[in-house]
Amino acid sequence: MITAIDTNILLDILAPDPEFLDDSVAALEEAARAGSMIVCDQVYAELCVHFASRRECDEFLRDAEIRVEALSAEASFAASRAWRAYRKQGGQRTRILADFLIGAHAQLQADRLLSRDRGFYRKLFPSLKLLDPSGRR
């Protein structure tokens, strides 16, 4: 079982959010027991902002047993189609392309996505299996 991890889950741990920290840690531990964990390039870039160096970010991911997996051309294309459909349906530009890349990456290169942003992903990636740690309460 491959679990893709969204940035918001990792930020719950890096910038401890008392509301979500325990649930996100438990969900990551559960994902690790179920198989492997990955992040796409976009999540990696968003995560690196919170570290002084690339080495520190890489160590954090290595310690968490999360590997970075590049977005495939197929996933990039799927993200572009989802973005286009979203805009045609009147979707506002409040959603950035990175969100679509994260969803397409998880749909095509993992078995599921661990994220607190389930409404967005459920609507635009209906076949994507989603795990929401806040549902653990």
Name every feature range the model reports, one short phrase each.
Residues 1-39, 49-59, 131-132, 137:
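Short, well-structured N-terminal submotif of metal-dependent ribonuclease cores
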Residues 29, 103-137:
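Acidic, PIN/NYN-like endoribonuclease modules and their adjacent C-terminal/linker elements
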Residues 67-112, 116:
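Active-site neighborhoods of divalent-metal-dependent phosphate/nucleic-acid chemistry enzymes
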